[in-house]
Amino acid sequence: MEKSNRSLKDLDLNALFIGDKAENGQLYKDLLNKLVDEHLGWRKNYIPSDPNMIGPEDQNSPAFKKTVGHMKTVLDQLSERIRTESVPWHSAGRYWGHMNSETLMPALLAYNYAMLWNGNNVAYESSPATSQMEEEVGQEFARLMGYDYGWGHIVADGSLANLEGLWYARNIKSLPFAMKEVNPELVAGKSDWELLNMPTKEIMDLLENAGSQIDEVKKRSARSGKNLQRLGKWLVPQTKHYSWMKAADIIGIGLDQVVPVPIDSNYRMDIQALESIIRKYAAEKTPILGVVGVAGSTEEGAVDGIDKIVALRQKLQKEGIYFYLHVDAAYGGYARALFLDEDDQFIPYKNLQKVHAENHVFTEDKEYIKPEVYAAYKAFDQAESITIDPHKMGYVPYSAGGIVIQDIRMRDTISYFATYVFEKGADIPALLGAYILEGSKAGATAASVWAAHHTLPLNVTGYGKLEGASIEGAHRYYDFLKNLKFEVAGKRISVHPLISPDFNMVDYVLKEDGNDDLIEMNRLNHAFYEQASYVKGSLYGKEYIVSHTDFAIPDYGDSPLAFVESLGFSEVEWRHAGKVTIIRASVMTPYMNQRENFDYFAPRIKKAIQADLEKVYASVNQKENV
């Protein structure tokens, strides 16, 4: 695959956002006006001899003017509603909630521009420009993940990308049985157990050698509905995204085949538990369809030991056990740019801090990247497929998810052709529709991601700096929270962060000193969340905005127990409460890496927390006095 040698040594992230206070607003308007003018000129210059369809007489008619007035009224109403009811997550240091932040100006401009053409990337003939851009984005995804022969594309979101990953795994795992039906010689001498444990590359090699029988083999695969219950278990960590359950339902393997793997005290997959589960099923002759490792879990930002999962697979393969590996890096995928040099080579760990310093990835000389996180990202290239969401850490507008596969030949296991949109065998520069789950899809999304990638190279000189700004901001926030204490209504409330971030997610709880009732602590945190969110009053006037979640026993097992016990609660109390309520922050703001910026907001955040806690306790006291 052709390498990207693009580099921006003097990149200034401040030039790429509209800005907290619209500091670059005029630049945005100038660029947008230029692009709109170019589109209008494009319309006028297409067959200029054609007559105008709308004349001065039309434009001066009462009905025309009335219609324009009505349209303006509707747009005024739209503007008022959006300005009144939207979340101010553009804020540099006020929004500490979901995976939202400033979006890149080039991505916004590209989307605004390309949507004027309304291209549909399902078919090249309806979107030649943006279909080729999406093909290029897919190649860039593959380079980012270290795939020499990979392929990728944009999807609506990470949920669909995960579903597509399971679709690949299901169909590939079923192919050996299909080959046995169509051409037994391809898999001669292999038992059913061996067929269920064939490595993906070996299956792809056999499919490639099936020649004219490929279509017949595909017909006899899992897409026919055969052997779905024979393919085995789909193992996911307890920190899984909820989309995996939906995917198992839709793909047809069933929820009973989805097995949660315990996580450790750092909220990463417990590799020993994973091995035990696999060996237990192997002893019962139940295969493992696949394993999901997460890079940037939704609620903790934890990065599973992908390298350890790969090492386990290599060990088990010697014993005749093999599983498909999918990395759900919807959240953390772009962080791999932190580890790639300008030649797309993975930077040795011993050189990483030096390279980061040379490229101004962090403002302070600290070790923000944990060795185990580095090792996990290095092993990405061993996974068969990876989910990556540009609309998260790619800082592009919704809706833009993505999936990338290790071997471009895998596309043939899920392909469908329709002559009116993508004819089989046609010589088309970007044939997307035949190899994806979705039908119609916005060309503007591809333009948006393409513009972001071409403004910020997917290496340490570009996106690495943006991811680094987020990570450094998260560490500043974590360190700030560690020492916070508040006096409210004669009580002392302390802040207890969950864990040091693997990525940029910071979770914490508020605990009243001396409280030994976990249910009461959960109530406090939920009440605080309500004060600091949309639940209580307009968001536009709130000085500190957060999100929350629950770590509950049905989903997490006892993995939160160590944290709960560190707060002074007993195991009995943990089982009685059944959950711990957490305040959760995805620190995506690109501004909090700067010490001066953070130091401005820190005391104001503390003041806002104090005010919200006072409201919480005032409400409690009022109820008690009624």
Swiss-Prot record:
Its EC number is 4.1.1.25. Changing residue 420 to A/F: Complete loss of catalytic activity. It catalyses: L-tyrosine + H(+) = tyramine + CO2; L-dopa + H(+) = dopamine + CO2. Changing residue 241 to A: Complete loss of catalytic activity. GO terms for molecular function: L-dopa decarboxylase activity; pyridoxal phosphate binding; tyrosine decarboxylase activity. Changing residue 586 to A: Increase in catalytic efficiency and substrate affinity. GO terms for biological process: carboxylic acid metabolic process. The keyword Cell wall biogenesis/degradation does not apply. The keyword ATP-binding does not apply. InterPro entries: GrpII_AminoAcid_Decarb, PyrdxlP-dep_de-COase, PyrdxlP-dep_Trfase, PyrdxlP-dep_Trfase_major, TyrDC_C, Tyrosine_deCO2ase_bac. In gut microbiota this enzyme is in fact exclusively responsible for the decarboxylation of levodopa, and thus reduces in situ levels of levodopa in the treatment of Parkinson's disease. It was shown that abundance of bacterial tyrosine decarboxylase in the proximal small intestine - the primary site of levodopa absorption - contributes to interindividual variation in drug efficacy and can explain the requirement for an increased dosage regimen of levodopa treatment in Parkinson's disease patients. Belongs to the group II decarboxylase family. Tyrosine decarboxylase subfamily. Homodimer. This is L-tyrosine decarboxylase. It comes from Levilactobacillus brevis (Lactobacillus brevis).
